[in-house]
Curated annotation (Swiss-Prot):
It comes from the Eukaryota. This is Iron-sulfur cluster assembly factor IBA57 homolog, mitochondrial. Residues 1-21 form a transit peptide. GO terms for molecular function: transferase activity. Belongs to the GcvT family. CAF17/IBA57 subfamily. Keywords: Mitochondrion, Transit peptide. GO terms for biological process: iron-sulfur cluster assembly. Disulfide bonds: none annotated. The gene is caf17. PANTHER family: TRANSFERASE CAF17, MITOCHONDRIAL-RELATED (PTHR22602:SF0). It is found in: Mitochondrion matrix.
Amino acid sequence: MRPTTSTQNICARCLNRGRHFSTNVQHRAQQPSNAIVSSPPQTGYARLTNRGLISITGIDSTTFLQGLITQNMLVANDPNRAIRRTGTYAAFLNSQGRVLNDAFIYPMPRVDGGAAAPEDPAWLVEVDKCEVSSLMKHLKKHKLRSKLKLRALEDGERTVWSSWKDHTEPRWAAYNLESESSSQFSPSSPIAGCVDTRAPGFGSRIVTPGGEDLRMHFPDEAQVAGGEVDLGAYTVRRMLHGIAEGQSEIIRESALPLECNMDMARGVDFRKGCYVGQELTIRTHHTGVVRKRIVPVQLYTGAQDTVPVDGLPAYDSSVEVPSPPSGTNISKVGARKGRSAGKFLGGVGNIGLALCRLEMMTDIVLTSEGTQYNPETEFKVSWTAADEGPVGPSDSGEVKIKAFVPPWLREYIASGGVRNTARKIDNEDAQRARELLYQLDEEEELRRNE
């Protein structure tokens, strides 16, 4: 079995949206293909056909988004409260503080079917293509009497790209996440974009009009380097950096933003005003401990060569590894029962992403209570045909799994995740935050055992 990518133009959740095979809450990986996924080049760009766009235009569009997303739509520390003119990573949450959609928000001068006046703000929201209709419903529910227009863009109207260049990955502390540099595109430009802050040196996000190759818009090699690669190569690169994307990996109404590293990725502004789902996110940041985070993992079998000891997983397109279904629990090898060590989210070949208990699967120490980590302990993902449902592989299987903490995430955690000045919170608030976290953990265990 050759390594395959689970990210295609149309995901299995879209294909099965009208099917009702089971009432169990199980999030599946997308249907694997038989294509061999090549290793990503050090320099290149990819057309992200798995992403969709929604335009939000009108005089109230900025205020509307400000109340719905985790990011600040205003320029930080600006006494005039100017509207930001740079793209940004963000998330939409439900009222319980769980992620509905991860997104990129881009300022646009005016898009088709847009603002009532040219001077009115206009925004593009980039989201998982399978989630465009769900997010549109969420936006319409909160629109009320706001003076704005919502529209899902058709295929071919605009194209989303990821572009990256060959350079050494910087350390998190040296990565200027707080900068509000001006956009590289003029306000009148039809092209939008931003730095992809989800990992240091990961590259840029670009949205171009039409479906032409990115080179048509950026002929200069200094602007966009390398050649175009397929979506699978981008996915491998993304997973090697520990970046989850879309609702097959950031599970809708289940994932928490800090567990998805959105704090490290500058996807959450902890100083802005109220927005939907803010309370738990802010309390966790200031008083709680994030015990689980999404990290890159290596899949291997007993007969396989040794896995890297530290650093990052190594992708090898020639390695044959069974592909676990998304949402499968991770457990210790040899353990009959016990607390789940994490959850496998998706993968390509012998690498992937998993939501892992850091003090169980890695050497990260979060509190003075001690850690359960033992470097000799191995972990596994086991599944049966019944677990996989209608879109998974037809056979049962088991594969070993090893978690890695990228250097920038390790440094961020070691720093205490302090990027903003924290306000003082009294003991009652701190206790309430801890109780909420324990309650969420218990709910997660109950869902898993149903």
